[in-house]
Regions:
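Active-site-proximal mixed secondary-structure blocks
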Residues: 1-35, 44-50, 54-125
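Short Gly/aromatic-enriched secondary-structure transition segments
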Residues: 39-41
Length: 125
């Protein structure tokens, strides 16, 4: 039998050890423009076609999905890590709220919803 060490529950247990989770980029429609946001806590949910990722209501991604009911998911290739990171660039300070970085990242529109994918990713949902 193995001796177990109890984990203190006063802080998130996931900060105490390494787990593997995919890097994804979530694409949403935001008013008259598009938003891209990298996420790393993403996973299939059960054996059916359900998928989940963690996002706080403080983020535009959450608000966009709540408003439109739609989002696209790109699983970037390992050599696209910098592109994924750039999609988290801050919004313009001119009050427009636009993320100009989205205009220069290699993207394409999805076939079925109004959102963007990252080109050359290995999986699109």
């Amino acid at each position: 039998m193995t001796d177990f060490i109890p984990l203190a529950m006063d802080a998130p247990i996931w900060n105490r050890f390494f787990t593997i989770a995919p890097l994804i980029v979530v694409g949403t429609k935001e008013d008259d423009s598009y938003d891209l946001a990298p996420k790393h806590m993403a996973t299939p949910i059960g054996p059916s076609n359900y998928f989940g990722f963690v996002c706080t209501p403080k983020h535009s991604t959450y608000r966009n999905i709540t408003k439109t009911g739609e989002f696209a998911v790109s699983f970037p290739m390992p050599d696209q890590t910098v592109l994924a990171a750039l999609s988290a660039s801050p919004r313009c300070e001119n009050g427009s709220g636009a993320k100009k970085i989205v205009d220069v990242l290699p993207t394409f529109k999805t076939n079925t919803i109004d959102a963007l994918f990252i080109k050359n990713s290995y999986l699109y949902l």
